[in-house]
Amino acid sequence: MLATKLYAPTLREVPSDADVVSQQLMLRAGFMRKTANGLYSFLPLGWRSIKKIEAIVREEMDRASAQEIMMPILQPAEIWKESGRWNAYGAEMMRINDRHDNEFCLGPTHEEMITTLVKNEINSYRQLPVNLYQIQSKFRDERRPRYGLMRSREFIMKDAYSFDVDEAGLEESYKSMYDAYTRIFNRCGLTFRPVEADSGAIGGSGTHEFMAIAEAGEADIVYCTKCDYAANIEIGKPGIMKQEEEALQELSVVDTPNASTIEAVADMLNLPLHKTIKAVVFSIDGKVVLAIVRGDHEVNEVAVQHAVLGSVEPEMATPEELEKVGLTAGFISPVGLQQTEEFAIVVDESVMETYNVCGGANKKDAHYVNINPKRDFNVDDIIVAPIRLITKDDVCPKCGGSLEHAKGIEVGQVFKLGTKYSEALQATFLDQNGRPNPMIMGCYGIGVSRTLAAAIEQYHDENGIIWPRSIAPFEAVIVPINAKDDALMSTSQTIYTALQEAGVDVLLDDRKDRAGVKFKDADLIGYPLRITVSKNTLENNEVEIQIRKTGEALPCAIDSVATKVTELLQNL
């Protein structure tokens, strides 16, 4: 490819609405352009990298005996209603009606579609196992699209679905996909960790997320420094933190004017946060749910949802919902409260091990002091569960070792679905005895476009992107200092041909721009190798090869360039 033929409009300034480094650099380097909020068009450089990621995914999926198919993006509402997810999926699902007023959605995922497809074709155990996958666009109506490709409304995803006769078969399929994902992300050059996770709206009995470690990640993960334990903080298992036992003091009310946060109360009463309890109120499945944790802890929304067996993600309760169940925002505790059909109380396990703590008095500008939960809560009428987020002070639930925290970008997830969809959609097969059984399913997703963004978040500097060789749009760029110099251009063309013949994916920058402009673009776009051809190098019958990752510049004889470049690329 010649640069004069390449459509790659670069920008010198950082776009004002670009939130994270990957978004900034993809816009500046001419990889994509914003179409609307959460929607992007890929330009040639970006699409080349996307296709390289897809090629790696296809090779490893095929190696794992998965077979590629393609299903419609547009899905009928009927199959989602049959599975029970039409309403449960919530506002993130993009729904449309055709001219006949039939309901459809733009697929956020394809469990219903693939199950409906397979159940009409497979009827015997002899036809199982089978694993089918596709790579296509998915759609989610994000409330706040942001971070470029990491939280967009349309994104490219590989989704695979396995069907087995029993749990042992599912375990084998799951391990096969887990191993394939490990190979895929290693080949893409990512630093990542598989972590235990929550299955969310997709459901199932077990799941792992593949997290690319990056400060820009939206997910918080914990991992053990001694063993292989790693988990999304939403599913991390906190221990019970016990306080030293104290003599129980008399419960009393104190005035706390305008102190509607637990931090303000602690400051006003000169209390450490761990001697307070705080309330967070959610709306889940139409029920108001009061969650109570220690003042120095944070509520785990996923754990609260599980504690009340909620089918939809928690949302913050509205003032109207608080009023309906008689709660006063900023001054709430379980003291004197009882659960009803419309109101649930969930208390963290560590709260139940506190003594003489402070919490809301359930009236404006007042708090209780000397709350003792085992005495003052209606313990037979509350749910006690581990609903706090794990902290740096917790220990590994597996081996007792120290835990480290990190930010991660979810680039893939594998699920053990079991019979959640096959039972709902009646996808059965006849076993060896002629009896019908539901197929045992797994599903496996990779965010292809998100993987691209994650790689940039991990590999960049102040000058631009530093691509892993495997997913770079071009592996090398040849930069003649002066495109008007026939000798330089002739040598550059010779090197270009030699590299192409050696199988190197190479770009020749034949633009007549100044050398400084070409160098800046090369660093911004992030080609792994830059081959500079100048009068000075030609005097010694050499060129200069610069490694983008290290900045190291190496002289190389012209007739050895193809060999040297191939050798260098093996280590990038």
Residues of each region from the PLM?
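Short, hydrophobic beta-strand segments
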Residues: G38-L43, I156-V165, E209, V411, ...
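Extended, low-hydrophobicity, polar/charged segments
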Residues: E111-T116, R144-K158, A168-G442, V448
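C-terminal structured "cap/appendage" subdomains that terminate the fold
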Residues: Y496-C556, S560-V561
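Generic long, charged, amphipathic alpha-helical segments
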Residues: G464-K518
